Design a protein with these regions (language model features):
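Glycine/threonine-rich beta-strand-loop-alpha-helix active-site module
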Residues: 72-177
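ATP/NTP phosphate-donor binding region
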Residues: 1-88, 336
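C-terminal charged capping/lid subdomain of soluble metabolic enzymes
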Residues: 302, 308-390
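Fold-independent oxyanion-binding glycine-rich loops
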Residues: 10, 16-17, 34-36, 65, ...
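C-terminal catalytic subdomain
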Residues: 256-319, 324
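Carboxylate- and glycine-rich phosphate/diphosphate-binding segment that chelates Mg2+/Mn2+
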Residues: 149-256
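Flexible, glycine/charged-enriched surface loops at secondary-structure junctions
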Residues: 206-214, 229-241, 256-261, 313-316, ...
Length: 390
């Protein structure tokens, strides 16, 4: 039995002004989980609460979720959920707020569970006994509004991706107007994060016809429209294209899963940068490493983008160059060293990072099976900005 699947939310609502769809969502008590201030500052929170009031839905707000949501924040939010007893959970804002809300949801429905109990992939028990989940993203990056993943940071700064189709939201509301206030650096970092999702999904060992179609279109759209959204954040067409492209990427990787680009990025705990920026700096080295077994797949991506090359090897080189050029156009450094990561700290910890990355859930679907030494070499190539030759 060659069993494959494609699982996404029941409802994906998209287009300018679709935040108003909240008025059609059924419920009596809504728990709104959000970040620190941006949703208040841009007026989105007022719109959300206004629509809930029109529907006679009571609500409470849990705010202050940090950029890399911690286990402690998740536990604190889960306690607030238990006190309020909602039947709707709204993840509002960037991926951190939505990911944190997903994890809180688990502990709200299963108060006796601890983080260690749900770290293994697909170990979360059935949800929706107490509440349904609505995701409203304000950035065009992770696609978490349609994915089975929530990235939570443990002590020591190590990011751990929780993975279960139970935490795939029930409703995703994609309103590009919410993204108009995103500053250029956030637009860039979230956009290249989405690109890393599509690139990894396409070469994953679990890729299929559904995920391939979404990944390719996402990659092409991001290359065309991310620079435009970066240059002019008020361009609603560019914002719409990017919001849909990152959503395609999310649906693709939620079903095909990811690879070592994410495994390596998850484990660098001493670097002060965004997840998306780290992903895209690592990506050229990852592609070069994986191309020894997945060269044809990367070549197909390059052809879809119209890049030059008469052989798989040449097409892979064109793809790597295109990613580097995109990064440069977005003001993203070419290496981890250029990013400012301390060299002594990196060299001291590279083996520790590599060992942790080897055990990351994303490594299991990488097209090339790595060793710890392989991953160290990929880290070093990304740190110094040289080519991978192994």
């Amino acid at each position: 039995l060659d069993l494959k699947w494609f699982r996404v939310p029941r409802d994906v609502v998209f287009g300018a002004g679709t935040l108003e769809y909240l008025k059609q969502v059924q419920g009596s008590k809504a728990f709104i989980c959000m970040g620190k201030n941006s949703m208040r500052a841009n007026g989105v929170l007022d719109k959300v609460t206004g629509y809930l009031k029109e529907s006679n839905i009571d609500y409470t707000i849990f705010d202050g979720v940090e950029g890399d949501p911690s286990v402690e924040t998740v536990y604190r939010g889960a306690e607030k959920m238990k006190e309020f007893a909602p039947d709707l959970i709204l993840g509002l804002g960037g991926c951190s707020a939505i990911d944190a809300a997903k994890a809180m949801w688990v502990f709200y429905e299963y108060p006796d569970k601890r983080f260690e109990d749900i770290k293994a992939p697909f170990s979360i028990p059935p949800l929706r006994n107490k509440a349904r989940f609505v995701a409203i993203p304000s950035t065009s990056g992770t696609g978490t509004e349609v994915t089975c993943v929530a990235v939570i940071t443990e002590q020591g700064g190590i990011k751990h991706p929780l993975a279960s189709y139970e935490i795939t939201p029930d409703i995703a509301i994609l309103d590009p107007e919410i993204c108009l206030s995103m500053p250029p650096n956030v637009t860039a970092d979230t956009g290249v994060d989405a690109l890393s999702h599509s690139l990894e999904a396409y070469v994953s060992t679990m890729a299929n016809d559904y995920t391939d179609t979404l990944a390719l279109e996402s990659i092409k759209t991001i290359f065309e429209w991310l620079p435009k959204a970066f240059r002019d954040g008020s361009d609603i067409t560019a914002r719409t294209k990017m919001h849909i492209a990152q959503n395609y990427a999310g649906m693709s990787f939620s079903n095909a899963i990811l690879g070592i680009d994410h495994s390596l990025s998850h484990k660098i705990s001493t670097i002060n940068t965004t997840h998306g920026r780290c992903n895209t700096i690592l990506m050229p080295a990852v592609i070069q490493y994986n191309s020894k077994v997945a060269g044809q797949r990367y070549a197909q991506i390059a052809k879809y983008l119209g890049l030059p090359g008469s052989s798989n090897e040449a097409l892979v080189s064109s793809l790597v160059a295109a990613i580097k050029n995109l990064n440069t156009s977005l003001g993203i450094p070419a290496s981890l060293k250029e990013l400012g990561m301390d060299e002594n700290s990196f060299l001291e910890n590279a083996e520790t990072y590599a060992k942790a990355a080897l055990e990351d859930p994303c490594t299991g679907t990488n097209p090339r099976k790595p060793s710890v030494e392989d991953l160290i070499q990929v880290y070093k190539a990304a740190y110094y900005g040289y080519d991978v030759v192994i």
